[in-house]
Amino acid sequence: MEWIADPSIWAGLITLIVIELVLGIDNLVFIAILAEKLPPKQRDRARVTGLLLAMLMRLLLLASISWLVTLTQPLFSFRSFTFSARDLIMLFGGFFLLFKATMELNERLEGKDSNNPTQRKGAKFWGVVTQIVVLDAIFSLDSVITAVGMVDHLLVMMAAVVIAISLMLMASKPLTQFVNSHPTIVILCLSFLLMIGFSLVAEGFGFVIPKGYLYAAIGFSVMIEALNQLAIFNRRRFLSANQTLRQRTTEAVMRLLSGQKEDAELDAKTASMLVDHGNQQIFNPQERRMIERVLNLNQRTVSSIMTSRHDIEHIDLNAPEEEIRQLLERNQHTRLVVTDGDDAEDLLGVVHVIDLLQQSLRGEPLNLRVLIRQPLVFPETLPLLPALEQFRNARTHFAFVVDEFGSVEGIVTLSDVTETIAGNLPNEVEEIDARHDIQKNADGSWTANGHMPLEDLVQYVPLPLDEKREYHTIAGLLMEYLQRIPKPGEEVQVGDYLLKTLQVESHRVQKVQIIPLRKDGEMEYEV
C-alpha cells in the first residue's frame, strides 16, 4: 500500500476525476432531457437509479481490464475499414445518439407531446432508466479505456469513478432544472448531442476527430447562449425596475387578449396552447374590455369613480315636510344625502327612501333625523378592491369619500364599483350618468363630460395616460396641462388627439370635445 503516499498517484486520481467529469457532461445533459419526460415525482428516482447503475457498470468494466483490452483488437475488415468490438460499440452508440437527439429535436420543434397517456408508468420509468444506462455504457467505454491508459492501480481508477459519479449525482438535479426551464438551452444541448453522436460514428469508422474541436465548438455555443440569457435577464430586470409585476402581467394578458401573441412574453406551455388559434381573436371585444377592467381594478382608487359632492342631490336636515315630498317626487335614487343646511360641504349621512315611505304609510310626519344612517367612509386613495371588500363586510352599498383633511369629496356606491367592470349599467328610468356622458359626433370627434374618469374615457378614445398622475378626470387632465382652470374654446393636444373645452360653469369644466388628429398634426375632418 506504499503507493498511497505517492504524490503521482494523487495527481493521477485528480486528473481522472476531472476527465470523468468532462466526459460525463454530455451524459448529464442527456439525462436532464430524458428525465423531463417522466412525472415530477419520478424524475429524481430515474436520475439516481440511472447514474448508480452506470457507476456499477463502470466498476465492472474496470474489474475486467483484461477483457476490456481485447475490445480494441480487430475482428473483421470491410474494404479499407477494420472494425474492432470497440468500433462497433462506438458505431452503435453514435447512431443511437443521433436517433435520440433527432427525435427529441423533432418533438421540440414540432411541438409534439412526448407523454404517451396509453403507456404504463412503470414501463416508461424503466424505459428512461434503460436509455440512461445504455448511453452511459457507451460513454463509459471511452472514459474507462482512458483511465486504464493513465493509471496502473485499479483502486485509484475505481475511486475516481465513484467520486466522479457522486459529483454527477449532486449536479444532475440543478442541471436538470436549469436546462428544462430554458427552452433555448434544451435545443442547444440536443445540438451538442448530435455533434457527439456524429463524432462517435466517425470514430467507429476510424476517423479520429480531436476532442478539442468539439469542446471548442461547444464552448463557443455556450458563450453565445450565455450572452443570450444575459440579455433576457437584463430585459426582465429593466422591466421590473420600470413596471410592477402586476403591470407587466396585465400588459402581457392584454396583448394576448388583443391577439398580439408575438409581443407577449410567453412560456413554452402558454405558446403551445395559443398556436392553434393562428391570428384569430381569442376573446371578443366585450370580453377583452371586461377582463382589462378587472385586471386594472386595483390600480384605480375610489376618487376616480366617485360622484363629486357638487353633483350630489342632497336635502337639508331641517327642511320642511313639503320640500322633502317634492324632492321624493323627482328623486330617482334609493337614498338621499342629508346635509346640515344648504351647504353640501357638511354631509351628515344618508336616508333610505323606503324608510321615508314607511313613515308616510304609517301616517307619521317625515322625520329625517331619526332615519339618518352612517355610511362607510373611504379615504380618497383607497383602491377599489379593498373598497369592494369593505362593502361586502359592512353589508352596505354606500360610502362617503374624504380627503386627508376629512372633508367629504364625494360619494361612491357598490354599483359604481360594478360599473368599472361591466361598464355603465342602465337604470330603470332613463337617466344619463354624467360620469359616463360621452357621445361620438358625426364628424368623428367625441363630446364628453369634464368629470368623466380617464379610465372610462380610454375605452373609447386611446389617450396616452401618465401612470403616476394625480388627477382622474378629463377636467383634471386639462388643468394639469394648462396649470389653471381652462377657458371655453381653449385647446390642448394630448397624443394624437386635441381636447377642446366647450363649456365651463362655476370654475368647473362641463363639456369637452375630443378631436382626432392626423400624424402631421392636422384635424381629420373639416371644421
Swiss-Prot record:
The chain crosses the membrane at residues 14-34, 51-71, 81-101, 122-142, 145-165, 185-205, 207-227. The keyword Oxidoreductase does not apply. CDD domains: CBS_pair_CorC_HlyC_assoc. It is found in: Cell membrane. One of its GO terms (cellular component) is plasma membrane. Residues 306-366, 371-429 form the CBS domain. Its main location: membrane. Coiled coil: none annotated. InterPro entries: CBS_dom (IPR000644), CBS_dom_sf (IPR046342), FAD-bd_PCMH-like_sf (IPR036318), FAD-bd_PCMH_sub2 (IPR016169), Integral_membrane_TerC (IPR005496), Ion_transp-like_CBS (IPR044751), Transptr-assoc_dom (IPR005170). SUPFAM superfamilies: CBS-domain pair (SSF54631), FAD-binding/transporter-associated domain-like (SSF56176). Keywords: CBS domain, Cell membrane, Membrane, Repeat, Transmembrane, Transmembrane helix. GO terms for molecular function: flavin adenine dinucleotide binding. Belongs to the UPF0053 family. This is UPF0053 protein YegH.
